[in-house]
């Protein structure tokens, strides 16, 4: 964003549209500014001064900073499994493993304009006059393109990638992402807890180069995620900071059993 007036009572965002917050006539929805030293007013909060490379922390009552444990995540993805449509990665099983403590730095660097399920707008334009659409949809007054949040475990172009009795905890974005072209795979008896974004993502939703209002209809049906089984898992405290996220989000998929 850029400051418009001084003193800094008014702020103009760099991209005039889409607006960083959903609005109706005369009413602005809430938006949030973070990581300012002036906002450090509640025990348990912290502030990172990027310029001086110092971290400031407001201790909780009774907390001894001489013995306190601090974990600072430095990586966004712990495990990445990716093949191709013609040569998918197959038959991997993870059992009784804890995946924890990841970060996701994009919102801190570029901001975060979420749409749904943690997907964020990378670009958008207003259309005037509005575009007429079929299927009884209302006329379209904008176009937008989406990005996909990072994940602690990312799987793409693969088959039979299983997770059994694993823990996914304290994560800076998505827990597990079966992104695209994943066939089969069991997630059974797993715990998803204390996660900033989605617990589990399955399916492509809207590829980066695909305008988000257009129906997703890939020419190669192998791109569609199919036959995943999510069984006897426990999801709690997901969407902790990105409130538009979900425990389980599955989009443009086939034959999934939850």
Predicted feature residues:
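Right-handed parallel beta-helix
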Residues: 90-101, 139, 159-173, 182-197, ...
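Short glycine/acidic-rich loop motifs that flank beta-strands on beta-rich extracellular proteins
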Residues: 103-109, 150, 172-178, 196-202, ...
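Extracellular polysaccharide-degrading/modifying enzymes targeting complex plant/algal/animal polysaccharides
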Residues: 4-157, 162, 209-213, 217-219
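Structured core elements
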Residues: 12, 56-57, 177, 199, ...
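Short, solvent-exposed turn/loop segments enriched in Gly/Ser/Thr/Pro and often Arg
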Residues: 179-180, 203-206, 246-254
């Amino acid at each position: 964003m850029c400051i418009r007036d001084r003193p800094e009572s008014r702020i103009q965002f760099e991209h005039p549209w889409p607006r960083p917050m959903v609005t109706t006539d005369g009413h602005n929805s809430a938006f949030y500014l973070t990581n300012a030293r002036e906002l450090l007013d509640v025990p348990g909060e912290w502030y990172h001064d990027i310029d001086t490379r110092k971290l400031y922390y407001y201790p909780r009552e009774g907390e001894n900073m001489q013995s306190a444990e601090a974990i600072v995540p430095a990586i966004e993805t712990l495990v990445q499994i990716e093949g191709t449509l013609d040569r998918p990665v197959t038959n991997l099983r993870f059992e009784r493993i804890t995946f924890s403590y990841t970060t996701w730095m994009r919102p801190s660097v570029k901001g975060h304009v979420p749409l749904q399920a943690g997907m964020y707008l990378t670009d958008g334009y207003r259309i005037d006059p509005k575009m007429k659409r079929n299927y009884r949809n209302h006329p379209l007054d904008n176009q937008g393109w989406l990005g996909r949040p990072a994940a602690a475990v990312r799987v793409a172009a693969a088959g039979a990638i299983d997770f059994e009795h694993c823990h996914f905890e304290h994560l800076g974005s998505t827990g597990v992402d079966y992104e695209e072209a994943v066939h089969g795979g069991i997630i059974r008896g797993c715990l998803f807890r204390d996660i900033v974004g989605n617990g589990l993502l399955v399916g492509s939703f809207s590829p980066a180069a695909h305008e988000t209002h257009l129906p997703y209809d890939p020419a190669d049906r192998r791109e569609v995620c199919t036959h995943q089984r999510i069984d006897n898992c426990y999801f709690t405290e997901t969407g902790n900071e990105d409130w538009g996220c979900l425990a389980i989000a599955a989009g443009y998929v086939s034959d999934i059993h939850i």
